[in-house]
Amino acid sequence: MAIERTLSIIKPDAVAKNVIGKIYQRFEDAGLKIIASKMVHLSEREAGQFYAVHKERPFFKDLVSFMISGPVMIQVLEGESAIATNRDLMGATDPKKADAGTIRADFAESIDANAVHGSDAPETAAVEIAFFFPGMNVYTR
């Protein structure tokens, strides 16, 4: 197994519910280290650029609107198979289909307000980390 890095975003719905600490605890309990983090309120331009891969999808406009509706917590996670571990912790995109005990099952409201984002592959993780943490001001600990 390899040490990986992945980007995680705690979305506006979960930030508003004040569950950042509970989600961070799940990351750490699963062996992931939080090696960079910041809270930001994304602009429409930033959210549009970050989710540009979905630009032609029917949900793009709603996704951008949701992501700018309040602050988000952005973090880089590091650990053994960090991408798969984080995706397992998050659960299915639709919280109604997410396994009990996953972040989305416990904290998400809907398929749109689904609490968290996580990179889906090493290549996207690298791009997403560089988007929010340019210059790789991210440190192993």
UniProtKB/Swiss-Prot annotation:
Top-level enzyme category: transferase
Active site (catalytic residues): H117
UniProt family annotation: Belongs to the NDK family.
A biological-process GO annotation: UTP biosynthetic process
Signal sequence region: none
Database matches in Pfam families: NDK
HAMAP family: NDP_kinase
Gene3D superfamilies with a match to the protein in the record: Nucleoside diphosphate kinase-like domain
Cofactor(s) the protein requires to work: Mg(2+)
Chief place of localization: cytoplasm
Residues annotated as binding ATP: K11, F59, R87, T93, R104, N114
One cellular component (GO) term of this entry: cytoplasm
Catalytic activity: a 2'-deoxyribonucleoside 5'-diphosphate + ATP = a 2'-deoxyribonucleoside 5'-triphosphate + ADP; a ribonucleoside 5'-diphosphate + ATP = a ribonucleoside 5'-triphosphate + ADP
Matches recorded under CDD domains: NDPk_I (cd04413)
E.C. number: 2.7.4.6
Compartmental location: Cytoplasm
Record InterPro entries: NDK-like_dom, NDK-like_dom_sf, Nucleoside_diP_kinase, Nucleoside_diP_kinase_AS
GO MF, any single term: ATP binding
Function: Major role in the synthesis of nucleoside triphosphates other than ATP. The ATP gamma phosphate is transferred to the NDP beta phosphate via a ping-pong mechanism, using a phosphorylated active-site intermediate.
Protein's recorded name: Nucleoside diphosphate kinase
UniProt keywords, alphabetically: ATP-binding, Cytoplasm, Kinase, Magnesium, Metal-binding, Nucleotide metabolism, Nucleotide-binding, Phosphoprotein, Transferase
Quaternary structure annotation from Swiss-Prot or TrEMBL: Homotetramer.
PROSITE patterns: NDPK (PS00469), NDPK_LIKE (PS51374)
